[in-house]
Amino acid sequence: MKTLSSGGELASIRNRIALVDPTDSPLWGSMSAPQMICHLRDAFRCPLGERVPPPFKATLLPALLFKWLALWLPMKWPPGVRTPPEVDQRIGGTPPRDFQADRAGLLATIDQFARGTGPWAPHPMWGQLTTVEWMRWGYLHSDHHLRQFGR
């Protein structure tokens, strides 16, 4: 299973982020490429305790089942999952400013996250996660949005 605790997978995600262009169009969803860069940084800042979104509940599946399926089912995350307002760049997330600076900030935050061992802030839907679970989430969330922009 791919995680950000693997140096090779972390390098792969970093390289894919470097390929994102501010003019890239999404293959799904309504986020722009600059918004996606800021969204990912905001999301990585949550387990680091730098952003604290309010808890929210899964609507279709119990949180523990949803967590297990999302993290360990061997399939890619599907398009169309709604973004919580606190990390939606059009509502409560950090708005894009300077693309190169925003991307550099994301890369620095991912590096900080990948070096981490906790303690971690709780996930807003799934509660406390282990370091292994957070590293898996980090890979999957990044991969999902990079695929959204063909990267």
Feature annotation, model-predicted:
Residues 23-72, 112, 120-151:
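Short, contiguous alpha-helical
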Residues 12, 39, 105:
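Charged catalytic carboxylate motif
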Residues 6-7, 106-110, 139-142:
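Membrane-proximal intrinsically disordered regions of secretory-pathway and membrane-system proteins
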Residues 2-5, 9-29, 35:
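Charge-rich, low-complexity N-terminal segments
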Residues 48-105, 113:
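Short, helix-capping/interhelical loops that line the mouth of catalytic, cofactor-
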Residues 79-80, 118-121:
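Short, flexible active-site-proximal loops enriched in glycine and acidic residues
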Residues 1-7, 17-19, 85-97, 106, ...:
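Globin-like tetrapyrrole-binding proteins
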